[in-house]
């Protein structure tokens, strides 16, 4: 008899019959099991049937996926994928509209299954669907429901990657683009059309060019002004895709009307006021809360917008380029006025002009006084720093002149070098905003203030250069303190950004509250446990308390594992998310896990989790790139965000249970809890943070009675013995 691990107990349903309770031997061929099931109901031709899940997306069971069947799973006996595909193909071309509609509903549902999709595509199903859409103006006006299911089925089939998107015809593209550009279209059709266009753009450069001929930016903007946030989300996702695929030469010109632009010029349009204001007013400042997927798309849009700066950031200045040198001359002219130009002074010679230029460039704060162009040869920030300086000088001229003249009038040792500061600040902002990096799949931390201005980066630079100048004065800094000042400014900016101000003015106010003295106060408060508790008695007390605190943290981690967590299965973003749950037995001896229909809101019982792993069988915990599921999936492996949340349990005999935590907090909880189960140290960032917090709190509580009392570094000396003990009184 096979070992119990090869036997799975399931229930199998068939319409109009009592369910069969069956023990499936996973070593038997699937065809043999299906024949046994058919014999139980006296069904002929078992080759016409297969098994599929009764719950969730109702996926087919194949030889490749049969090991995913868990104890207690409910299965259905169903028509085989090839037979189902053939039947649906016939029904989709029926003369009866009711039959065709029912067929399309079923097709849209089954197309999410890769086994069925393969069979249907092999029967030229994609071609049939595209022809239905291409001839679909009549369908649109009278049978929008059928068209919506047709587009859903098409998108699901194409998402499997079985066939190339390049096989799509121009007629089909025109039809889909027509649904997007028409003013009154059914919401379901519009949603699927936007999703199809997004996939086309992302998967084929040639299709991008064809779509560009059919849609204008203005047509996409109209979908951002609707009240349906799902439509807005799909519209921004398409905008992001177009932006990402825009040719480099289309990303530079910022002087065109965005509404009339074809989508080949999508990257230009993002710098235009109309598009930005529509997103700001109808999406970010709308009356509805921003959902997770919308927040992600806004984050992607923000990243791609800032990435337009990458070319300038990585461009070195050419000291021999007169046009570039003229920008530096312009900075000098604006700061010191044209009257001081040595070329206007009668009889001024070349040497005299050079001397005056050198003096002015020194006052402007450049490192290379003779040839300041050399200051811009380092990348990053390259020419982007010069762009920022010129923007400040022209748009905020009073601020620029005040900063330059204020510093040039100080003593040499206390002047804040504007040129050097601007270059380093630009580099710092690029690092903080991660200019040039691709968006992460799991992030959604967009900043509303960056959508409030067409030149958000330049405006941010203007605010931060004033902050730098203010902080320099507060620190009474000299040239030797330059790096210290930059560290403080970085801290001020990174402390202000997480508050997500709604406008640049709010950001400026937040920075104003984070003065140098406030930063010192915050640093002192954060270092309190390190700076205030370093005397030997306090260190000894901390060492005595620490094991108790670690035990407390360990119990909390194990309790959280006993409560359990739900983990998302990686899949297509558009498809309904699937979850599975894992929790530790109350006796800490077994891990229970199993699939879920959806994300649970309450407690998941042990009885509903069919699988289990004895803790004694766990050999190791691996994380990140060492996880088997990170090695297998190249797309996931490249996603840094997912990689940082991945971990796997290795257990006997050579099996793995793979996790991707929903967030960093859950990741730390599970890594700590599993490490504690195996008797290893808990080394996560969360444990270090909790240990510091709890230790600090416990120390403060125990030292309350010693407030304002100086604790000596060494114990007091033992006094000498008294000369006599006559003072002792004996009762009696």
Curated annotation (Swiss-Prot):
Q: Which UniProt keywords apply?
A: Apoptosis, Cytoplasm, Membrane, Phagocytosis, Phosphoprotein, SH3-binding
Where Phosphoserine occurs, residue numbers? Answer: 515
**Pfam families the record matches:** ELMO_ARM, ELMO_CED12, PH_12
Q: Which domain of life is it from?
A: Eukaryota
According to the UniProt entry, which residues carry Phosphotyrosine?
Answer: 48, 729
Domain ELMO: from-to ranges: 323-497
> What's one GO MF term for it?
receptor tyrosine kinase binding
**Chief place where the protein resides:** cytoplasm
Q: One GO cellular component term, please give it.
A: membrane
Q: Where in the cell is it found?
A: Cytoplasm; Cytoplasm, Cytosol; Membrane
A Gene Ontology biological process in which this protein takes part is: cell chemotaxis
SUPFAM superfamilies per the record?
ARM repeat, PH domain-like
Where's the PH domain?
A: 565-686
Q: Coordinates of motif SH3-binding in the sequence?
A: 712-719
Q: What does this protein do?
A: Involved in cytoskeletal rearrangements required for phagocytosis of apoptotic cells and cell motility. Acts in association with DOCK1 and CRK. Was initially proposed to be required in complex with DOCK1 to activate Rac Rho small GTPases. May enhance the guanine nucleotide exchange factor (GEF) activity of DOCK1.
Subunit-structure text: Interacts directly with the SH3-domain of DOCK1 via its SH3-binding site. Probably forms a heterotrimeric complex with DOCK1 and RAC1. Interacts with ARHGEF16, DOCK4 and EPHA2; mediates activation of RAC1 by EPHA2. Interacts with ADGRB3. Interacts with AUTS2; the interaction is direct.
Q: What is this protein called?
A: Engulfment and cell motility protein 2
Which lineage?
A: Eukaryota, Metazoa, Chordata, Craniata, Vertebrata
């Amino acid at each position: 008899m096979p070992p119990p691990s090869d036997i799975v107990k399931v229930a199998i349903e068939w319409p109009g019959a009592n369910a069969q309770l069956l023990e499936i031997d996973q070593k038997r061929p699937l065809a043999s099991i299906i024949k046994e099931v058919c014999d139980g109901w006296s069904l002929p031709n078992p080759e016409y049937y297969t098994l599929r899940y009764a719950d969730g997306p109702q996926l087919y069971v194949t030889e490749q996926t049969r090991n995913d069947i868990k104890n207690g799973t409910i299965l259905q006996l169903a028509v085989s994928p090839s037979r189902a595909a053939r039947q649906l193909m016939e029904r989709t071309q029926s003369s009866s509209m009711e039959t065709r509609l029912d067929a399309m509903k079923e097709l849209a549902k089954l197309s999410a299954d890769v086994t069925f999709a393969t069979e249907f595509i092999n029967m030229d199903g994609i071609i049939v669907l595209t022809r239905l859409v291409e001839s679909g103006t009549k369908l649109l006006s009278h049978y929008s429901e059928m068209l919506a299911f047709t587009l859903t089925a098409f998108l699901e089939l194409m998402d499997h990657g079985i066939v190339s998107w390049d096989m799509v015809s121009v007629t089909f593209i025109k039809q889909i683009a027509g649904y997007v550009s028409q003013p009154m279209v059914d919401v379901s059709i519009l949603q699927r059309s936007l999703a199809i266009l997004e996939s086309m753009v992302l998967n084929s450069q040639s299709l991008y060019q064809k779509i560009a001929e059919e849609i204008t930016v203005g047509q996409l903007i109209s979908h951002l002004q609707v009240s349906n946030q799902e439509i807005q989300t799909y519209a921004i996702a398409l905008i992001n895709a177009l932006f990402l695929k825009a040719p480099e030469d289309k990303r530079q010109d910022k002087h065109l009307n965005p509404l009339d632009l074809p989508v080949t010029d999508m990257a230009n349009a993002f710098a235009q006021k109309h598009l930005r204001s529509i997103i700001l007013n109808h999406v970010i400042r709308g009356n509805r809360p921003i959902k997770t997927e919308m927040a992600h798309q806004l984050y992607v849009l923000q990243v791609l917008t800032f990435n337009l700066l990458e070319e300038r950031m990585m461009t070195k200045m050419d000291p021999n380029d007169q046009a570039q040198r003229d920008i530096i001359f312009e900075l000098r002219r604006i700061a010191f006025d044209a009257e001081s130009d040595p070329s206007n002074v009668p009889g001024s010679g070349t040497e005299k002009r050079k001397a005056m230029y050198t003096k002015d460039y020194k006052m402007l704060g450049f490192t290379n006084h003779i040839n300041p162009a050399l200051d811009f040869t380092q990348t990053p920030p390259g020419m982007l720093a010069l762009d920022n300086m010129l923007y400040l000088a022209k748009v905020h001229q009073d601020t620029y002149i005040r900063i330059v003249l204020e510093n040039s009038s100080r003593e040499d040792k206390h002047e804040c070098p504007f040129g050097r500061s601007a270059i380093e600040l630009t580099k710092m902002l690029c690092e903080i905003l991660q200019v040039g990096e691709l968006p992460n799949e799991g992030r959604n931390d967009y900043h509303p203030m960056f959508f409030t201005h067409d030149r958000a980066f330049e405006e941010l630079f203007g605010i931060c250069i004033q902050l730098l100048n203010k902080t320099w004065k507060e620190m009474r800094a000299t040239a030797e303190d330059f790096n210290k000042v930059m560290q403080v400014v970085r801290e001020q900016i990174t402390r202000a950004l997480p508050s997500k101000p709604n406008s640049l003015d709010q950001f400026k106010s937040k920075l104003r509250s984070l003065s140098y003295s406030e930063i010192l106060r915050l640093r002192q408060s954060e270092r309190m446990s390190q700076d205030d508790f370093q005397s030997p008695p306090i260190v000894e007390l901390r060492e005595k308390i620490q094991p108790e605190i670690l035990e407390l943290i360990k119990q909390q981690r194990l309790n959280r594992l006993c409560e359990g967590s739900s983990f998302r299965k990686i899949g297509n973003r558009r498809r309904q998310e699937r979850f599975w749950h894992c929790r530790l037995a109350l006796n800490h001896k077994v891990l229970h896990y199993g699939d879920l229909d959806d994300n649970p809101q309450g407690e998941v019982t042990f009885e509903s989790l069919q699988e289990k792993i004895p803790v004694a069988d766990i050999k190791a915990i691996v994380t990140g790139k060492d996880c088997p599921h990170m090695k297998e999936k190249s797309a996931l492996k490249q996603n840094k965000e997912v990689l940082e949340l991945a971990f796997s349990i290795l257990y006997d005999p050579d099996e793995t249970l793979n996790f991707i935590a929903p967030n960093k907090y859950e990741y730390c909880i599970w890594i700590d809890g599993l490490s504690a189960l195996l008797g290893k140290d808990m080394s996560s960032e969360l444990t270090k943070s909790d240990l510091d917090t709890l230790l600090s709190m416990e120390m403060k509580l125990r030292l309350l009675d010693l407030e304002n009392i100086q604790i000596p570094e060494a114990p007091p000396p033992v006094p000498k013995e008294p000369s006599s003990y006559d003072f002792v009184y004996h009762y009696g």
